[in-house]
Amino acid sequence: MTPDHPTSVEIKLEVRDLHVWFDKRHAVRGITLDIADRKTVALIGATGSGRSAVLRALNRLHDLDPAARVEGSVKIDGAEVLGQSTDVPALRRRMGMIFGEPATLPLSVYENVVFGLRAKGVSEQRTLDAACERALRQVMLWDSLQKQLHESALSLPLDWQQRVCIARALAVGPEVLLFDDPSSKLDPVAAQQLDDVIFRLRRDFTILIATNDLHQAARLSDLTFYMIDGEIAESGETLTIFSRPTDSRTEDFLAGRAWS
């Protein structure tokens, strides 16, 4: 099920008949969707609906799970992602992933942010310094952290650690950002501040957010896909989905009558 797009819209991500299995459990069941360049898409649904499994298929994180099997087609700018010839590290730089639990490294703030660049072979100090400052400005932390760059990132509040992780993804120059329940470990105030960061990033990146925070989905996304048992039950413009859903199951979920 794919929302209609004007033919002039440039499609960044194309997903066709995507299936994901974990051993015998069929977690994603043949979904199809198009995501336009620099649009923000929310994947909503109850726990176990397949939201996170879709995100992890997009940048090949399921490769790390021997129990996982992925079939179908995922393309970024028309190039197949799931093929054997795909440069997976390069793909993951193009599609940065941010998890609910901050993946903070036991390193300084600076080394956390430039970690991906160093892994890519970048060693020129001015390049690293500029990338670190730019990325921390993008997540609205530069003014607060510019004098703490060489202190441990693990000493930061959890919400700042999450933003440092976003900065690490930004430093390598991604085109797509994948957020998997990014606020799930944060208190309401910190979650709102993180939403402010993501809102600022919307104009420059294609963004997918898998979230069970309906306020987050409503505020940040252009399109919303509601998933049930690995399938897309309803999709469309976010304002329409939240105000005038056509599927009674969507209405029940948004009203809090279908949580699991």
Predicted regions and their residues:
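ABC ATPase NBD coupling module
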Residues: A67-R69, E80-G96, A119, I241-P245
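Short helical segment in ABC ATPase nucleotide-binding domains corresponding to the A-loop/adjacent helical element
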Residues: N59, Y110-A119, D129, H150
